[in-house]
């Protein structure tokens, strides 16, 4: 019986691989111009409309570190990126553990109520960047002429580089029913995300704007964690929405999710230093593996925050 099981496994694998390959080839027949809503968001143009759009995004970022471009993707774009995410969803690294805001280990020398000692259940999945082919929909959007320049101009950062991490420069977060993603800070300074698919219920994006812009601000972090902060904003992102967010300074989370439909969000990461990659421990937590480059470049960061 075990012998026949081994024989049937190979044909099944080949059929699955062929189906996945055909789907990827089909997705590559379209272009980024069909995926991005260039009528409302002329990011590749040098005109008054683009200037007005930039001014609006900059105001939002200045106010609370978050800007949302509704319906940035076309309907066709949403469908293509969701289909691509579905085709590689089995490659997601699923993790179920307990983490603190900083993804660091417990430090028993600190007071018990210190936010560095507050740990929460985490259930989440990330599809690493090396699963998305160069000509696929996600990377077509990422590499579209004008996309990266628009993001840089919106953020108004003189030092702006695409994240060099081969597992994390552009990924898809796949969140299934459960606790979502608890409160945390991003290790990269600027995060750009595309909402692709919502869960059946829940999954709101919640954040406390810029609470550690001038320092760690442990007191306000504690208030967010215990539910007494008045700084928390709740945001409902719809499929196709583009979000620019300063996650290095703003504590944020994905609220608990409900239902069988996974929540897909594409994440594009940019940083202030060239050649930056994730810290080995954080990378292992999020993607289930590290590459030699993570060990070689460990510690390459300009700021002094604890994560």
Region annotations inferred by a language model:
Residues 67-73, 236:
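Short amphipathic
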Residues 1-63, 290-307:
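Fe(II)/2-oxoglutarate
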Residues 89-93, 155-159, 274:
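A generic secondary-structure signal for well-formed alpha-helical elements
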Residues 134-139, 148-242:
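Catalytic core of non-heme Fe(II) oxygenases with the double-stranded beta-helix
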Residues 29-52, 62, 71-146:
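Non-heme Fe(II)-dependent double-stranded beta-helix
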Residues 72, 173-175, 195, 246-248, ...:
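Structured loops at beta-to-helix junctions and adjacent beta-edge loops in soluble globular domains
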Residues 206-307:
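Catalytic core of Fe(II)/2-oxoglutarate
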Residues 18, 54, 144-148, 189, ...:
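A structural signal for well-ordered alpha-helical scaffolds and beta->alpha junctions
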